[in-house]
Structures are given as C-alpha cells and as structure tokens.
C-alpha cells in the first residue's frame, strides 16, 4: 500500500505536445484542387464514422490568395456566409476534472459545443459556380476586342468591383476575429515588399472579406487593396500573398511557434493547387524577351520548392504535401472555361488517388488528437456529473462524446 502511494505520487512524464496545421496554396481558379481534396478528406472522415467538423481538428489554418478563400470558408461562422452550412448537430465537448487529494473523484464539465460551419463539400462551388463572377470574360469582338486588350495592357486586367461584390456576398461583415480556430492569410505589403499577415487572434479589426481581398490582389489582374489599420491608423497597400509566399507553409510554421511555443511537434497538411513543375529550356531561348517570359514562373517555382524543403528539414516538423505533377498543361489562374474546370477536376482526382494513402496516415494521428485549446466553442461551461477517477486525459483534458 505504502509503495503504491509512492508510485502514485511520482511526477508523471510530460506527454508529447503535437500541433496540427493546415496550409493551402494560392493559384486562382486552381483552388479547385485543394477544395476537391478537402471534400475527399471530409468524405473519408464520414466513412470512418467521424462527424466532428473538419476544421476543429487543426490548431492553425493558413492560406495564401485563393487558399485564404478556402481557409476562411472552413473556419468562419456560417451566420453571414454565402456558403452551405454543414449538416448535423453541433458537437459537445467535455473536460474531465480531477478533485480530491487522497480519495479522488472526477467531474465531467461541459465546455461547450463545436459549431457546424461551412460544408467542406460545398467549397468547390466557390469556383465551379462563381469563377465567372470574378474573372469576367471579355465577350467583345473585332475592333472593340483589340481596343479592350490594349487598354488592359495599360492597367489591371479585371475590375475589382465584381471580386469585392463576390467576397461581400460570401463573407458579409463578419470579423476575422470570429474564426473558430486560429486562421491566417498571407499578403504582401508594397511598402518594403514585406509579408503582411492577417491573424484571427490579432485581427486589428479587419473583416474576413478584407483579408480575402488583400491576399488575392494579384498584380496585373486586380488593383492593390488599400486599407487603414483600425488599431494603428496605418495606411496599408497590399497585394497578392503569392508574391512572397504562394505556399504559406513557412509563414504558418513561424506563427505556430509563437502560438504554441511549448509544442514538441508540428505536423502540417500542405495542399497544393497543382501548379506544374517548372522546366526551363535555355537552348531554345534566343532573346532576352524569351527568357523574361519564363522567369516569373521559374522564380515562383524555385521559391516554393526551397521553402518546402526548408520547412521539411526543421527538427520536430512533419509535412504531408499533397501535390503531384499531373496537369498536362499550365492552367492560368483566371481560366474559367469548362475545359479548364474539367481538367482541374480530373487532376484533383488523380492527385487524390496517388496521395490518399499518405493523407490517411496523417488523418490517423489528426483524429486521435485531443481538442485544441484555442478552438472557440459555443455555450458556457457547466458541471455535467461526477465519476470515479479516470486516467490522465492528455493535452487540454478535453474529450468528445463517444
């Protein structure tokens, strides 16, 4: 008995703390690919009998450009969103609280509920049904078409009004701070060409649609987004986050280290937009103009590759990168044609078929993890019932109903 008392009193070893991150690349209409992958992941969770909302498994969700649209669609409250709400009841979360020094008992405390937000399976519709609302094709002909092309050479290719109307329709006036898990969007500040990160946990009063507008302001396609920071009164001129981090994985890791400094591991699910590998053929480029036409894509591809390699080399970081070179030709970020959409959907299925086993392994660990301590829950805490002492619940002591 005395030996058993000493054994019980021994300090328990600290359990390994693992944080899970979802990152989504930029790429305009190629956002069809990560939206499709998330749809398949959600279907897989249901096949496993898990109906907990997908977003609630992650400790941080990050996006660049079109990836931000998907990230916010996953994590923001549905009340004002132009997205289909996921069906099903909210999920109750309880905490096991131990009481008593010698005769231990436990109480089950209702911590709140995990809300149903945007249905991951409806994210595809943002592109397949709304692409032409944002990238309005030029239907003019003859001389007027030539005049239109010449005018666009001197300015941005698209008017920002349709984009802003679409974002207002989807997000309304919902605040970025209302995201239910930490969510971030990468944009580029033209002052110094530095990154500007929109953070739900330090939102400076920004709206969801403002973050989405800034991070998707692709140069030559849309005019920069100009905002006044509501906390500092600083004037910000922001452009597409893809200029500095089309794959937001490094920015997400940096922010995760700040949010969760005591974590032992960071496991990242990184979703691509299926941009094809960049292959240069210098022997074919005779003039500087020919070189220049390939340099932008070469720089972007090289930047993404070295960023991914750098994060993968960090101790304590594991990356599940969902990308395969399946697109037969490059699809422009504003290509809303039926052929382009069909090609992207076909590529999405091929990528899923090739990478799903690795994703399943990631999901095995993800779904076994405890509820994150930064997940915002509905309703207030209250004691449900008292029970005999139980085993240590793990990080945060939070449980889902069986």
Residue ranges and their predicted role:
Residues 2-402:
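Conserved catalytic cores and adjacent C-terminal regulatory segments
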């Amino acid at each position: 008995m005395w030996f058993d008392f000493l054994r019980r009193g021994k300090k328990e070893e600290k359990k390994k703390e693992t944080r899970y991150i979802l990152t989504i690349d930029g790429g305009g209409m190629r956002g069809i690919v990560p939206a499709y992958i998330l749809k398949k992941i959600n279907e897989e969770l249901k096949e496993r009998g898990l109906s907990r909302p997908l977003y609630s498994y992650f400790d941080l969700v990050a996006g660049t450009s079109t990836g931000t649209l998907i990230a916010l669609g996953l994590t923001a409250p549905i009340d004002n969103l132009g997205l289909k709400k996921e069906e099903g009841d909210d999920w109750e979360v309880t905490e096991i609280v131990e009481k008593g020094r010698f005769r231990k008992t436990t109480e089950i405390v209702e911590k709140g509920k995990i809300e149903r937000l945007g249905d991951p399976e409806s994210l595809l519709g943002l592109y397949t049904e709304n692409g032409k609302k944002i990238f309005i094709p030029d239907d003019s002909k003859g001389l007027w078409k030539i005049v239109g092309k010449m005018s666009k050479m001197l300015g941005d290719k698209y008017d920002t009004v349709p984009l802003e109307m679409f974002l207002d329709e989807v997000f309304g006036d919902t605040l970025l701070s209302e995201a239910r898990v930490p969510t971030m969007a990468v944009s580029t500040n033209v002052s110094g060409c530095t990154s500007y990160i929109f953070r739900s946990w330090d939102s400076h009063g920004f709206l969801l649609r403002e973050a989405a507008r800034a991070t998707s302001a692709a140069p030559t396609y849309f005019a920069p987004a100009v905002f006044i920071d509501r906390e500092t009164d600083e004037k910000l001129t922001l452009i597409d986050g893809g200029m500095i981090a089309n794959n937001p994985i490094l920015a997400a890791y940096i922010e995760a280290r700040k949010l969760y400094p005591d974590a032992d591991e960071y496991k990242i699910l990184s979703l691509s937009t299926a941009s094809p590998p960049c292959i240069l053929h210098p022997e074919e480029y005779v003039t500087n103009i020919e070189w220049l036409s390939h340099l932008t894509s070469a720089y972007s591809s090289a930047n993404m590759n070295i960023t991914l390699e750098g994060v993968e080399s960090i101790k304590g970081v594991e990356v599940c990168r969902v990308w395969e070179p399946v697109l037969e030709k490059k699809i422009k970020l504003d290509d809303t044609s039926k052929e382009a959409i069909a090609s992207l959907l076909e590529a999405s299925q091929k990528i899923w078929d090739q990478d799903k086993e690795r994703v399943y392994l990631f999901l095995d660990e993800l779904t076994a993890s405890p509820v994150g301590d930064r997940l915002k829950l509905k309703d207030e805490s209250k004691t449900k019932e008292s029970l005999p002492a139980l085993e240590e619940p793990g990080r945060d002591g939070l449980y889902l109903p069986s």
